[in-house]
Amino acid sequence: MNLIAAVSLLICSVRGFQQNPPIASTRRLILQTSSHPRILTQQTSLFSSTQTNDSKPKNKRRGNKQFNNKKKRKREVGVGKELKNPDEVITWRCFGITVYPDDLGPSLNIDKRKEKRDGSNVPSERSYLTPPVISSLLSRLRIKSEEATDGLPSILQDARVVRRSLDARRRKGSDPKYTYVIDIDLTRQAARNLGLAPQSGKMEILDDKKLKGQDDDIANNAEDSQAKPRIVIVGAGPAGLFCALSLASSGLCTPILLERGQPVETRGKSIGALIHRRCVDPESNFSFGEGGAGTWSDGKLTTRIGRNSGSVRYVLETLVKYGAPERILVEGAPHLGTDNLVRLLRNMREDLRELGGEIHFGTKATKYLIEDGKIRGVEAECVEVNERTKSKLIDSDAREHESFKTFYGDAVVLATGHSARDVYEELHKAGVELEPKGFAVGFRIEHPQRLINEIQYGNDWGGRVFTKRPSTDTVNTEHFEKLSEGTAESHQGTLPVASYRLATDKAFDGEQNRGAYSFCMCPGGQIVPSSTEEGELCINGMSFSNRDSLWANSALVVTVSQDDPILDKYRSHGCLAGLEFQRDIERKAYELGGMNMTVPVQRLTDYVNGEVSSSIPASSYRLGAISAPLHEIYPKPLYNALSYAITEHFEKQMPGFLIEDALLHGVETRTSSPLRLVRNRTTLQAGGVDNLYPTGEGAGFAGGIVSAAVDGLVVANAIKAKFLTGDGDGDGNAFKSSKSIGFDY
C-alpha cells in the first residue's frame, strides 16, 4: 500500500467509525485493493452519501457511472429506503425469456383445427406458461426452483405471456429458440424483496396508458350532448371499422358506414364466381367488401408501430373480443387467416349496429359534396333491387334502395383503401389536395413450402414442421427423410411453417441503387387475383389460419419514387401518374395471361437470365398459369434492379432461394398507394377541406391491418375532440397520436 492510500485510510477510518463503522470497514477493504490515485478518489466518493455535509468533498466527482445508474434504478422501486406505497401494484415486463423447442416438446403446436368457432377454447396468455417457460422466468428473477417460497405461486399467478417469437437464425452450433416477453403484476414491496430493478433489454416498469382509456372523458361527457353529430365513413376496412366502432361506443357521434362491396357472406359468393367463372365484379371482389383487402389475404397483424405499444395492444384485444384467436396477443408474428376474419367481421358488424351505428353495403360513394371549403356529405350509387341482386341487400340498413342516395353528415371520413382509384380521381376533380408518393411494384414469388422449411431450419429441424394437415405434413416429412437418410439429429420439439423477409437498398438498376424487398410473405398459402376492373390483372397472396398448403409465396418488389424517370410518360396525368403506371402494367399482365385471368409466370432462374421458361412447375393459383416473358413487362431499370437484388443479395441472404422450382407470378402492383391525401398534422383534416378526414392505407397513412386500424382510431379521437369541445379547428394532439402511422413492409 503506498503512502497516499495509507493516509487516506487513517483519516477515513477515524471519521467512518465515528459515524458508521460497517461502511468504513467496507471502504477499507476497497482501498486495500487499489493504490491508483484516480481509482482511490472514485472509490472514496462511492460512500459520500453516508458522510455529513462537512465531510463531503467540495468538488464532488460524479463517481462510477455504472454504480450510480444502479443506485438510480434501485431508487425507482424503493430499494434502500422506506417505500411510500408498498402495496401499490406495478407491472414488470421481462424480456428475453428463452426456451428451446425440444424443452417444450411436441405439445408446442396448438391444434388449430380443434378450435371452436366461438373461440371459447383458443389458447390464452396463461396457456403459454408451461413448466420450461416458468423455469426460465424464475432464472431471470434469480429464484431457484428448490428455493421457492410460499409467496412464489401468487407471483406466477399474475404472470402472463404477452409475446412469443421464434428465432430460427442458423448460427453455428445453435438450435432454434423461442423468446418470450412476460408481464408480472407485483406490489412494490414484493419487487423490493426480489431485488428487481429496471435493466435495459431485460426488465422494465410499464406505464399502462392504453388508447382505449383516452376516451373516458369523452364517453362521460357524451350524455350531455343534445344532438349527436352524424359522421359519414366511406369504406369498411380496418380504418373505417375501428373509426366507426370508436365513435359509436363513445356515444357522442352516430357513424354512418358506407361500403361499396358486400358483407363477408355475400362477398364470398362473388369471389367464388371470380374463381370458377373468371368474372370480376368491380364492386365485390378480393379487394372490395366488408373488412377490406385484408379479409381475403393472410390477415397479418404485424406492424412497425411496436407490438408492445398501447394502441396496438388495444387493436389486438378488440379483435379477440370479436372472435379472433387469443394467441394473436402472444405470437410474435400473429395472423388471423381468412377463415377467422369472416366470423370476426360478422360479430363486429352486429355490435356496431347495437351501438347505434348504421351500415350500408352495396353503396358506392360517387360524389363528395364540398361547399365553401367544407364537406357536407356524399352522394352514393346503391345496388338496384331485383331478383338477381336482392340477396346482396339482406344485410344493408338502407330502407329505400334507390339508384342514388345522398348521405349528409357533420364530417366525412375517407377510409377507401389503396385500390379505390376512382375515389382518387373524384377527389382530384373536387379540388382535394393530393400528392404523389413512392411505392413499389414487382411480382409474387412462390416456392414449395418444404424448400423454405429446409432453407430456414436446415435438415435437422425442417422435418419437425407440422401443420395438422396429413397430406402436407407427409410431403414435408418424406422430403427431409430423403435428405437426411437417417443422419439428422432427433428432436422432440416442433416448429411452425417457415417464413422469410428479404431486403436491400442496393438493388442496382444500371444507373442508381433502388430498394428491393419481400412483402406480405404467406407461408402455407396461395396466390389469388386481386383485380378490381375488367381487362386488368394483379395478384396477391393469402393464407388460411392453419397455413397448411404446399406452397409459400411472397411479393418481390422494387421501389419507384414519385419523381422517378420511368413515370415521365405518365406525367400528363399530374399527381395521378403513379396510378396510370400501375394500370398500364396490369393491362400488360392481363394480355400476357391470355386475357382470361390466367396468370403469366416464369421460373426465377429464367427471369434473371432473361429467358422464357420452356416448362413451369405447379402453382397454387387456381385460375391457371402460362409461361410468359415477365422480364419484359416492367421498364428496364426495374428489371435490372430486381434481378440484381435476387442474384447479389437475396440468394446470399437465403442460399437456395434462387432455384428452378421458384416461380414468379405477374404482377404485384398494389403494395401501397402511389398517392397521399394531404392531411393537417394537428387537426387530421384534409388539406383545404374542413371536416374531411382521410385515414388508412388509401389515404397514405398506414400499411397493414393493424396500422390502418390504429390510424382509424386516431382520426376518431380527433373527431370526438372537435365535436366535444365545439372547437372548429379540433385537436388531434389531445390524444397523443396525431402523427401518421408507420408502414409494415
Regions found by a protein language model. Name each.
Residues 47-48, 57:
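PEST-like intrinsically disordered low-complexity regions enriched in serine, proline, threonine
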Residues 23-26, 33-35, 59:
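Intrinsically disordered, low-complexity proline-rich segments enriched in Ser/Thr
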Residues 18, 24, 32, 42, ...:
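Compositionally biased low-complexity segments, especially N-terminal hydrophobic helices
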Residues 3-4, 49-51:
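Absolute N-terminal positional cue centered near the fourth residue
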Residues 56-180, 184-296, 300-318, 322-745:
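Residues forming the flavin
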Residues 1-29:
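N-terminal chloroplast transit peptides
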Residues 14-15, 38, 44-45:
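Sec/Tat signal peptide C-region and signal peptidase I cleavage site
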